[in-house]
């Protein structure tokens, strides 16, 4: 009996010793040879690690490189100089990633990790990139027109919209991001049935990046795919006075809107929903025959007043293949009047853009 107990104890000690030796070997390999442990492929998933070091950092240098344009930063990718013990190309790449939202992960053979540098009053993250990878990164940036992260594409389109135009290729890239595809998954085809993908993109761009990425973060994309989450997202855009959000709520969630929305939110849906849409007309008919029909009567009185103005100032949603010349010819309105009414400084249009059409002169 004592022999068996002693044998079991020896086996436990042996297994523990082997485990500790393997751990020390991995740490030795990583520290002495400065290699990444996940290169050994011992783990099923990516091992993202950050290291931290205290160094001297000049705030003037950091401020100067932070204000550099993307073209200036990319030009530094060929620079072989060192600043504060680090290649200046690494400093430039860190700014390109953090400030200009450049995405280089498609050309990397391993997950992107960072080293945190701590100065007396500042902190800085430098990417752990092998200097041999910079030619590949340069080729990638030259060959791709929009090598940005999802947020970078969002901010770029947001800037274009403010200028009155959007590049369709950039819009296509944004609509292919995991965040936007998650939003479309939540809608279960409602965006296509009731409107268009371009109109949906226009809505989320107009309401800002903070709201969009709050709802479409990585945690939500993996665990929050439900009707409740869809209603929560659309309700948020409804609070932004978005007509499309009101319409999308009526495609799959009209029962929730009719029976569970408070009076204030229901009135908002009625006020914002496009009157000409079959979904709106069907919902309004159901509302008139429901216990909440008094809201239909109140909203009808409020909607009638703007319709007089609509006859004078019509709106048109740009479709695929439209041009200013075709729209002007279709509605019998001079092109210069449309340009003046919408404050355009060019003739480029993208699907989903809403044009205000001036009243026809008799």
UniProtKB/Swiss-Prot annotation:
Compartment list: Membrane
Kindly report the protein's main subcellular placement as a broad class. membrane
Per the record's keyword annotation, is Transmembrane helix included, yes or no?
A: yes
- Residues that span the membrane, as ranges: 13-33
Q: Does the keyword DNA-binding apply?
A: no
Query: InterPro entries per the record?
Result: LysM_dom, LysM_dom_sf
Keywords, in A-Z order: Membrane, Transmembrane, Transmembrane helix
| Domain (LysM) ranges | 314-357
Q: How does it sit in the membrane?
A: Single-pass membrane protein
Q: Which GO terms describe its cellular component?
A: membrane
What family does the Swiss-Prot or TrEMBL record give for this protein?
Answer: Belongs to the chlamydial CPn_0593/CT_474/TC_0759 family.
- What is the designated name of this protein? Uncharacterized protein CPn_0593/CP_0155/CPj0593/CpB0616
Q: Which organism is it from?
A: Chlamydia pneumoniae
